[in-house]
From Swiss-Prot:
GO BP annotations, alphabetical order: proteolysis; symbiont-mediated suppression of host innate immune response; transport of virus in host, cell to cell; viral translational frameshifting
Sequence ranges assigned to domain Peptidase C6 in this UniProt record: 644-766
Name of protein: P3N-PIPO polyprotein
Residue ranges of the motif Involved in interaction with stylet and aphid transmission: 360-363
One cellular component term from this protein's GO annotations in UniProt: host cell plasmodesma
Keywords: Host cell junction, Host-virus interaction, Hydrolase, Inhibition of host innate immune response by virus, Protease, Serine protease, Suppressor of RNA silencing, Transport, Viral immunoevasion, Viral movement protein
Biological source species: Plum pox potyvirus (isolate NAT)
The organism's place on the tree of life at top rank: Viruses
Length: 1020
């Protein structure tokens, strides 16, 4: 039996003789010499044929079902192609429908041609021609839908290079010219034969040599240093035809550094190992014998040969290349060659030996030994060496100060070590076994500190984290320790009143002993204009009694200004309205560490009970200062007008800034009030916290130190609503509140400290939310002031940076320039502020440049190009003007917009902004035109009034004939002045003739005509 395996199928067959063997056996039996043998071979042959037929029928029946089942796959595989996958697996890949259609079309064409050929009549072919007519015989073919082909013809043109053919002489001439060009320009030459040979021309001892690149120059020591075939050798011989090749070298002239030099062996005096008599390529010397690079040497000899390479040049080349790659690209100066190159080499060697000491810079053992050394070993062995090198540089090369500084710092870093092992041991002994916090943090810090100079950056970060945990633990522990009960807290008012030197100076008091504000009175209007309301006495005081706050209400005693002559009724006014009573608690105190900060606490009596506020009587037009001590009454800066001012709801803390103004010098009052209005109040907003208010006071105290001892107005503490009330001159009808002890600005600033433990830091104080600056409104104000000298003068003095808003419109800028406002601003500020004078001068120059542009877009381009220059000139710090930050933001926006537009234009994008300046100019130009028309109208009216007055005065004394002549002269004069023709009496209508007293008729409209008639009418 025999077994055949097909995949997972196993077939068992009877042993049979193959057909070929049976035939061979039958032939052998039919030979003559075997005819007498028995007929046994016939039986064998028949048996073999029977077995073979049985086997073939069994095989066919076994595969028949499988072939029928796999017939669709075989049909599809007919058009598939074989591909090899990633790991060598070969498989079939299905073809696309387009490919199958192409194959079927090709088969159909071939079959049709074959049938046409077979079905055609027999004929003798005399000539062969192509019949374009379609044959009558059609072969059935599958229906194929032809799709249109969208193929773009390739525009690529095939370039056919002309073959270069040169004669031997031309080739020799060509190579000589290549050699001459390489020698003149110092270029490399590559000779490509069986192997590539690279060479270049070099000069040594005033002789020119051709030098090939040999393998030992790369650091290896091969047996063959260079391999040349015969063709390459001939070309190399032609390139080596130099002065050095023909030079007769004496003994010892071939020295190190000449590796790869091509010389004539016939001109060498030294003993040498010759490869041939045509060339000698220097490799080195072995046992006083020069060795050719082409000679084969043993491995032992290759290590013993003294190679004539130039390690110094290799080091120099590597150093130069690396230095050029790593050098600073951005420097603030132009680098020059000031230091001697040779001395630079000396110092570089000293630095190299100081950082990495070694016997040879190429020694691998020295490098490995240094890399295996610990930092302590390096410190012990080389710190003295570094100090010696530092002294050498100091004595011999003092001009290398930067190297000296580096060595000094490097030596100091190496010596950083912690030798206090006793402290480390004691800490470990005391708390080393304790793993809970904070002892775990202490142990970790102890382990890190003992490292000393070996601490890494990560160690420093870890030590800081553990130290922070210790600080947090200590802070929490300190807060949790109670040093005593709050019942023992006492904070009495000082028996001594605070002395305010500003209110005692005779130079600042008038004859009645009242404080004189001086220039401070004018600048204080910024507070009253924005943060105070004028009390209308005719409406009574009742509407001002209740003051609302975000957390409750407080009643003022302003109603007590109306007093009764009845003593009993008058005594009732001394009674206030009680608030909720609060005992002394933690909310009343402030601590820093374990100690109370008494000026930031509420006032108490001797027995520890809180000092509660009583009714505070009102006054008229006074500023009351002196919080916990005796109050001092100062007349308000606006008392002369007789009006009464009351703070708007929510901004009573402005009284604190008004009290600080008393201590401000008169020449600084303007800056102080503008700083408060423009910088601090917008940041504080409505109802700021006491911490924010104290921070603002600290900001002012830094700028104006004389305000530190300024007295505070009375401040009441409402613990129920958690609000501070700054009491003004109208007092307080609400009673029972606590009183803050802080009496000066310096004491109030303590609330700004983060280390102060106080709940009162978060209490609210009065404030105000001011409107943000509107650019469009300010530009309209600037336009309105162009032809109004009084408004322009106020703008120039109080808000000079408002002039910079003219850059938003070329028309506004030109109007400012033409009206003379910029010149006037320059003359005003030239003696007061050089920076503002420079800005106005720049605006004048910019207006002159804008006037040269013919279109609006060109004018805006001129302004945009100068926005960056204006921004750099304007933005020089903080200025006490409300318009300053608005001008800075405007210029900054224009600068950024210009830079981005330039980038877009460079990239080829269009900017839509070119259409917007026309809209802005259209919006602003009517304002300028209207102002100018009003000025012209006023001028016409004044001119008419003058002419009418003159005519009325002089015509009374004239004769009637002279009077008519005078009227004609006046008409002519008026037409010359106003540039408007006047109708003669002959041209007038009958109605106008009856009104012969009318001098001229303007043409500005019927309303203006009527007004002019009323102004210019007079009788003849």
């Amino acid at each position: 039996m025999s077994t055949i395996v097909f995949g997972s199928f196993t077939c068992h067959l009877d042993a049979a003789i193959h057909q070929d063997n049976a035939d061979r056996l039958a032939k052998a039996w039919t030979r003559p010499e075997n005819r007498q043998v028995s007929n046994a071979h016939l039986l064998c042959r028949r048996a073999a044929e029977s077995l073979i037929n049985t086997y073939e029928s069994a095989t066919a029946s076994a595969w028949k079902g499988l072939e029928e089942k796999l017939q669709p796959m075989f049909a599809k595989r007919e058009f598939s192609k074989t591909v090899t996958k990633r790991k060598g697996l070969r498989c079939f890949k299905e073809s696309s429908e387009k490919f199958i259609e192409k194959k079927l079309r090709k088969q159909y064409q071939e079959e049709r041609e074959r049938l046409q050929f077979l079905n055609g009549p027999d004929a003798i072919v005399n000539q062969i021609s192509v019949d374009k007519c379609e044959a009558s015989v059609r072969v059935p073919s599958p229906h194929i839908i032809e799709k249109p082909s969208f193929v773009t013809p390739s525009m690529k043109k095939k370039v056919v290079f002309k073959k270069v053919r040169m004669s031997e002489a031309s080739l020799q001439l060509f190579m000589r010219r290549v050699a001459a060009n390489a020698k003149a320009n110092g270029q490399k030459v590559e000779i490509i034969g069986r192997k590539r040979v690279v060479g270049n021309y070099t000069t040594k001892s005033r002789l020119t040599y051709f030098r090939t690149h040999v393998r030992h120059l790369d650091g290896s020591k091969p047996r063959y240093d260079l391999v040349l075939d015969e063709a390459t050798k001939k070309i190399l011989q032609l390139f080596a035809n130099t002065s050095g090749f023909h030079h007769v070298h004496k003994k010892g002239e071939v020295t190190p550094g000449m590796s790869g030099f091509v010389v004539n062996p016939m001109n060498l005096s030294d003993p040498m190992q010759v490869y041939d008599t045509d060339l000698f390529i220097v490799r080195g010397k072995h046992n006083s014998i020069l060795v050719d690079s082409r000679c084969k040497v043993s491995k032992k000899q290759s290590n013993e040969i003294i190679h004539y390479s130039d390690p110094g040049k290799q080091f120099s080349d590597g150093f130069t290349n690396s230095f050029m790659q790593c050098k600073l690209r951005e420097t603030d100066h132009q680098c020059t060659s000031d230091l001697d190159v040779k001395e630079c080499g000396y110092v570089a060697a000293l630095v190299c030996q100081a950082i990495i000491p070694c016997g040879k810079i190429t020694c691998l053992q020295c490098a490995q030994k240094y890399s295996y050394m610990s930092q302590q070993e390096i410190r012990d062995r080389f710190s003295t060496v570094i100090e010696q090198h530092e002294k050498t540089v100091m004595d011999n090369y003092p001009q290398f100060s930067h190297v000296l500084a580096f060595l000094k710092r490097y030596r100091e870093l190496m010596r950083v070590e912690n030798q206090n092992y006793e402290a480390f041991k004691d800490i470990t002994h005391m708390i080393g076994e304790r793993k809970e916090a904070p002892f775990s943090h202490l142990n970790k810090i102890n382990e890190l500190i003992i490292k000393g100079g070996m601490m890494s950056a990560q160690d420093y970060i870890e030590a800081s984290d553990h130290l922070r945990e210790l600080a947090r633990y200590q802070k929490n522990r300190t807060e949790n320790i109670r040093s005593g009960s709050i019942k023992a807290f006492r904070n009495k008012i000082s028996s001594k009143a605070h002395v305010n030197m500003q209110l005692m100076c005779d130079n600042q008091l008038d004859t009645n002993g009242n404080f004189v504000w001086g220039q401070r009175e004018y600048h204080a209007k910024r507070f009253f204009r924005n943060y105070f309301d004028v009390i209308d006495v005719s409406e009574g005081y009742r509407r001002h009694i209740v003051r609302e706050n975000p957390r409750g209400i407080r009643k003022l005693a302003i109603g007590n200004l109306v007093m009764s002559t009845n003593l009993a009724a008058l005594r009732k006014q001394l009674l206030g309205e009680e608030c909720i009573h609060f005992e002394v608690s933690k909310e009343c105190t402030s601590k820093r560490g374990e100690n109370f900060v008494y000026q930031c606490c509420c006032v108490t009596h001797e027995d520890g009970t809180p000092l509660e506020s009583e009714i505070i009587s009102p006054t008229k037009n006074h500023l009351v200062v002196g919080n916990s001590g005796d109050s001092k009454y100062v007349d308000l800066p606006t008392a002369k007008g007789g009006a009464m001012f009351i703070a708007k709801a929510g901004y009573c803390y402005i009284n604190i800034f008004l009290a600080m103004l008393i201590n401000i010098n008169e020449d600084e009052a303007k800056s102080f009030t503008k700083t408060v209005r423009d910088t601090l109040v917008p940041k504080l907003g409505t109802w700021p916290s006491m911490m924010d208010l104290a921070t603002a006071c600290h900001f002012l105290a830094v700028l104006y130190p004389e305000t530190r001892n300024a007295e505070l107005p009375r401040i009441l503490v409402d613990h129920e609503a958690k609000i501070f009330h700054v009491v003004d001159s109208f007092g307080s009808l609400s009673t029972g509140m606590h009183v803050l002890k802080a009496n000066t600005i310096n004491q109030l600033i303590s609330f700004a400290s983060d280390t102060l433990d106080s709940n009162m830091k978060t209490y609210l104080v009065g404030g105000l939310e001011v409107d943000k600056c509107d650019e469009f409104k300010n530009v309209k104000l600037l336009i309105r002031s162009i032809y109004k000298p009084q408004i322009m003068e106020q703008v120039l003095k109080e808000e000079p940076y408002l002039l910079l808003m003219s850059v938003l419109s070329p028309g506004v800028l030109m109007a400012l320039f033409n009206s003379g406002s910029l010149e006037k601003a320059t003359q005003y500020w030239i003696t007061r502020s050089h920076s503002l004078a420079a800005i106005t001068s720049m605006l004048s120059a910019l207006a002159a440049k804008v006037s040269l542009a013919s279109t609006l877009n060109a004018q805006m381009s001129v302004i945009d190009e100068h926005a960056a220059v204006l921004y750099d000139s304007v933005f020089v710090g903080t200025q006490p003007y409300a318009s300053y930050m608005m001008a800075v933001k405007t210029l900054e926006r224009m600068k950024a917009r210009t830079e981005s537009d330039h980038t877009l234009n460079d990239l080829g994008f269009s900017v839509l902004r070119q259409a917007t300046p026309h809209l802005v100019e259209k919006k602003l130009s009517p304002g300028i035109g209207a102002s100018l028309e009003r000025v012209k109208l006023v001028g016409k009216i004044l001119c008419n009034l003058g002419i009418a007055a003159m005519a009325k005065t002089y015509t009374k004394t004239f004769h009637p004939k002279r009077r008519r002549r005078f009227r004609r002269q006046v008409r002519h004069l008026r037409s010359v002045i106003t540039w408007q023709p006047v109708q003669t009496p002959e041209r007038r209508s009958p109605m106008e003739k009856r009104r012969c007293g009318l001098l001229y008729i303007p043409v500005d409209g019927e309303a203006i005509l009527q007004s002019h008639r009323n102004l210019t009418k007079f009788s003849s």
